[in-house]
Amino acid sequence: MLFPVLHLPKAMKFSSFSLIASSLLSLVAAAPVTLLKRDSRWDYANDKIYGVNIGGWLVLEPFITPSLFEAVSSDVPVDEYHYTEALGKEEAEKRLQEHWSTWIKEEDFKGMANAGLNFVRIPIGYWAFQLAEGDPYVQGQQEYLDKALEWCAKYGLKAWVDLHGAPGSQNGFDNSGKRGEIGWQNTTGYVDLTVQVLDQLTSKYGGSNYSDVIIGIELLNEPLGSYLDFDQLVDFYNKGYQLVRNNGNAPVIIHDAYLPDHTFDNVLNTEQDPNVWEVIVDHHHYQVFDEGSLSQSIDEHVSTACGWGQSENTEYHYSLCGEWTAALTDCAKWLNGAGRGARYDATFGGGNYIGSCDQLYTANYDYFTPEVISNYRRYVEAQMDSFLYGKNAGWVFWCWKTENTIEWDMQRLLGLGIIPQPLDDRQYPNQCGFS
């Protein structure tokens, strides 16, 4: 998820909770260029992805599980790097093993399938495969990734394995493992280590052993293109592509680096190099990380969302929205980083006051009146329609569950009727004018 920090271009009532919990329990129970395709695991030209991210599990994020970070000390660590550094390896491993084994379980995958989803994006950090010198991180995540893929197979879900964090940080966001400096390209050692990790990752997960489940390897999540050397990034993508091909036939996913649409049309282009095939561009879309977006009316939010799909439909590569949200504010606790407030109420970023965050800081169902639910539902439907338009390959919501938020929590949003059931149900059809 995008956390544009450092000026970079990312108590409920019992009766309400019971109603939502009951809904959730019943849900869980119940002009395109023709690109050469050499693997039958997924047809990006015709099949559509309806997916969800498993955030805050194998890569920690303070806004998803704030209790983990608050339990360390009064001096709350801001990311997984500082979390493990503060606890030391032995205690960090003990706590993370408990988190990994309880935060996501088999029943979650059953719930995803029952909700009509067909896909899961699973973030994992480089440190699950190799450590850089001096890293405080602990390992053990691969065991749980393996379990997740087994559960995907059991419930008919496809998956991407997403390298979410690189040494030195590719974006400075806490979800890269280390908040602050964007140091990934500062030394060739960091990039080289990332390439080595990709080799390990693709040799294990990119071959035939997982071809019934894995329909993509994402080379790197959200490299921040405006702060990185573009030529070096393209070189990394080329190397990563070749590693995937050396180890198997999995589709290769490259992130758009938050650069304009069409930036990567001539990167890994089949028409320029017939040996290149099955490359997908991953776009992430949010309207909550700048004051201008937060100030928009619901009609403006819908119009912006519709424009995404129209533009990306004309890109050379097939594209997919690998992260999006129902959120119309940045009010969720620590969304902008541990210890930080929100732009919406002017407690972060130094901008103008837009509105109160009092009822959105944590999961307060009283805020979600019929009118509020209607606005959120309109926005969600517009995004879904946009990301499914034309050759756009689908969408992956961020994220499946959180401790304390509603705007970012698919399970709670399903219970409120903000995310449609079935997923193609429309209360506000054809908002984008595509038909």
From Swiss-Prot:
Catalytic activity: Successive hydrolysis of beta-D-glucose units from the non-reducing ends of (1->3)-beta-D-glucans, releasing alpha-glucose
GO annotation terms (biological process): cell wall organization; glucan catabolic process
GO CC term (a single one): cell surface
SUPFAM superfamilies: (Trans)glycosidases
Signal peptide positions (record): 1-30
Pfam families the UniProt entry points to: Cellulase
The enzyme's E.C. designation: 3.2.1.58
Gene3D superfamilies, A to Z: Glycosidases (3.20.20.80)
An example Gene Ontology molecular-function term: glucan exo-1,3-beta-glucosidase activity
Keyword annotations of the record: Cell wall biogenesis/degradation, Disulfide bond, Glycosidase, Hydrolase, Secreted, Signal, Zymogen
InterPro entries documented for this protein: Glyco_hydro_5, Glyco_hydro_5_CS, Glycoside_hydrolase_SF, Glycosyl_hydrolase_5
Active site: 222, 323
Annotated disulfide bonds: 306-432, 331-357
Cell compartment(s), UniProt: Secreted
Top enzyme category: hydrolase
Function of the molecule: Beta-glucanases participate in the metabolism of beta-glucan, the main structural component of the cell wall. It could also function biosynthetically as a transglycosylase.
PANTHER family given in the database record: GLUCAN 1,3-BETA-GLUCOSIDASE I_II-RELATED, GLUCAN ENDO-1,6-BETA-GLUCOSIDASE B
Family, as annotated: Belongs to the glycosyl hydrolase 5 (cellulase A) family.
Protein name from the UniProt record: Glucan 1,3-beta-glucosidase
Protein species of origin: Pichia angusta
Taxonomic lineage from the root: Eukaryota, Fungi, Dikarya, Ascomycota, Saccharomycotina
